[in-house]
């Protein structure tokens, strides 16, 4: 699985600039900003939750709420979408957290949460999971990624000589609970490429999400790939 060409979309400065503009737009026009990959991608995630929420996750309690982490949350739209149907989509009690390495993104998400009166139901925090291990404890039941692995894959940075997308895979594995699920949506990698990358690094495939397929010059493909992984229980013994 080769890397992607380096791009400005893989830099923190690019996303800081994007979200600083969106903060201004929200303040002036109540414009919540772009829905990354479109609302159709979010509806596929909602459908996946409807199909799997009752069979794939543990029992929850007040002492041990269901924990959802959205990596690269941006304007927080995905978590807001889940909250719109929280009674049917999510176990109760539930803790929703969105993190992003752009402080401007977190400002925007918090502003939107207040506007929608969701501030008491979701938490947003500035965090670079590549460089900060604050959330790297194995207690997240559901980790969501909608475009974050894509953006990281466009970075030319290295950490200890490793591409950041390789470090990212390890970070996610370190945050996921033993029976938790990592659900990733990508527009840059195929299902096969994602499966190859993650199953070589301690994951097994839980399920895939059907997406529209197009055909061009005899080849078939899709605009996005959506796949769910769990931790391979035998990984540390290999």
From Swiss-Prot:
Enzyme Commission number: 2.1.1.-
Keyword Nuclease assigned to the entry: answer is no
Q: Which residues form a coiled coil?
A: none
Could you tell me where this protein is found in the cell? Cytoplasm; Nucleus
Q: Name one GO cellular component term.
A: cytosol
- Primary localisation category: cytoplasm
Please give a single GO biological process term from the UniProt record: vesicle-mediated transport
Q: Establish whether keyword Transport is in the entry.
A: yes
Q: List the disulfide bonds.
A: none
Quote any Pfam family the record assigns. Answer: Methyltransf_31
Any idea which UniProt keywords this protein has?
Cytoplasm, Methyltransferase, Nucleus, S-adenosyl-L-methionine, Transferase, Transport
The cross-references to CDD domains, in alphabetical order and at most eight, read: AdoMet_MTases
Cite the GO molecular-function annotations of the record: protein-lysine N-methyltransferase activity
Q: Which domain of life is it from?
A: Eukaryota
Family assignment?
A: Belongs to the class I-like SAM-binding methyltransferase superfamily. EFM4 family.
Which HAMAP family does the record associate with it?
Methyltr_EFM4
So what does this one do? S-adenosyl-L-methionine-dependent protein-lysine N-methyltransferase that mono- and dimethylates elongation factor 1-alpha at 'Lys-316'. May play a role in intracellular transport.
Q: What is this protein called?
A: Protein-lysine N-methyltransferase efm4
